[in-house]
Regions:
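Short peripheral tails and domain-boundary helices/loops at the edges of structured domains
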Residues: 147-169, 335-383, 390
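Hydrophobic beta-sheet segments that form the core/acyl-binding groove
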Residues: 109-155, 300-348
């Protein structure tokens, strides 16, 4: 152990002149012209997920799957330990990239090809990197669209998550620019166009049958079913600390002075970070759908169609798009269930279904060509695929 003397220090402020010519105003994030196709950003900061953080996320966001709550249950199914929720892994990976990717963003346009490729356990440390796939510049006065691929690595530099998203960003147009973290040439970026899931040898313990509801096995799900989830979740100012807990640095989500300077539906007050809304919606579906999920096969075509604010109550509806018997492909009897999740705000899911019916399941961006109006109560839409245990 190194021992270094540390004497009390004297006050300096009262006798130190103020130097107005040495003022620093660090600016974070990138404008549209600061992105170049093919660049790779290594994002600052890493996050170690301890056991308490993992369980707190799962319970705060209402996930009922015992894999994220019980080490004994997870180990009995062949995993090394309790799993970190896939939504927590996704939120951390996205949030670590905000400073480089989207801190100047006007909006997140969509999530695509989200793939969870390896288990994440308590005490794992996650880092993230982003590759710029495409920059669509629509002119000086219009926001452009930046398409990115982000990967998330654990402390062994193993790929645990890969996903893509599109971000709407303005050009600087005279606004002061920052000095974003430089691009790393020849950065290690183990992306893959042919993702492979790496899981341990899974087991099917019978002693945990009572740990989950009997109506959430693969055999319970049929194409065409619609699950109207009966409980909502009122979002409070808790979203402020949770935004930073997962590493998101965009001031739109926690700075009232910043938000009050923005006009339009995204301005006036802090917007709840969309990844948290996504996690709450998935959590609300879990008792009906994913309680017996053994692995999250991913998400795609995810869109935040309206912002959420503190005080909003969010509700959810799930539609079963397809089911596929996977036999023993994963070592135990399972099946894949392809879902469409619809998020709503300030309306009960029952009332929304009665009021809007099949229009709920039509993409909001497709409404115009079908001669329909967008729904102000609808806040989110995404497709998800999950691997669910059979009854055994």
């Amino acid at each position: 152990m190194t021992k270094i003397p540390n004497k009390p220090f004297a006050e300096l402020a009262t006798n130190t002149a103020v130097s107005k010519d040495q003022v620093k105003r660090n600016i974070y994030g990138r404008y549209l012209e600061e992105f170049t196709e093919g660049e790779i950003f290594e994002h600052p900061r890493e996050i170690t997920i301890d056991r308490a953080f993992a369980q707190e996320f799962a319970t705060t966001f209402m996930d009922a799957n015992p894999l994220f709550l019980s080490a004994a249950y997870a180990k009995a199914h062949g995993f090394q330990d309790m799993l970190v929720s896939s939504l927590q892994v996704f939120n951390i990976a996205l949030s670590l990239g905000v400073q480089n990717d989207s801190e100047k963003a006007l909006a997140n346009l969509g999530y695509y090809n989200v793939q969870f490729l390896k288990p994440v356990y308590p005490e794992d440390t996650l880092s993230a990197k982003t590759k710029i796939l495409k920059v669509d510049d629509k002119g000086t006065d219009k926001p452009g669209i930046v398409s990115v691929r982000t990967i998330c690595l654990n402390q062994k530099k193993e790929l645990v998550l890969q996903y893509e998203r599109k971000i709407m960003i303005y050009r600087s147009n005279g606004n002061p620019k920052g000095n974003p973290k430089p691009v790393i040439k020849d950065a290690f970026f183990p992306e893959t166009d042919t993702p492979v899931i790496e899981l341990p040898s899974l087991k099917f313990p019978t002693e945990f049958n009572s740990a989950t509801w009997p109506d959430t096995y693969f055999e319970n799900f049929k194409q065409g079913q619609i699950y109207i989830h009966q409980n909502g979740r009122t979002i409070t100012d808790e979203h402020f600390p949770w935004t930073y807990r997962v590493g998101n640095t965009h001031p739109l989500h926690y700075d009232k002075l910043y938000s009050s300077g923005i006009s339009g539906p995204m301005g006036g007050k802090p917007v709840v970070y969309g990844g948290l809304v996504f996690a709450w919606l998935c959590g609300m579906t879990s008792r009906d759908i994913t309680e017996n999920m053994i692995w999250d096969l991913g998400f795609t075509e995810g869109y935040h169609t309206q912002p959420s604010f503190s005080g909003d109550t969010v509700t959810a509806i799930t539609r079963i798009l397809a089911v596929e018997d996977r036999g023993n492909d994963f070592g135990i009897p399972t099946g894949a269930v392809h879902l469409q999740i619809i998020g709503l705000k300030n309306i009960k899911a029952n009332d929304a279904f009665d009021k809007f019916g099949e229009d709920l399941f039509l993409k909001e961006n497709d409404k115009k060509k079908h001669g329909k109006e967008k729904l102000s109560e609808k806040i989110f839409e995404i497709e998800r695929k999950v691997l669910i245990k059979k009854r055994g």
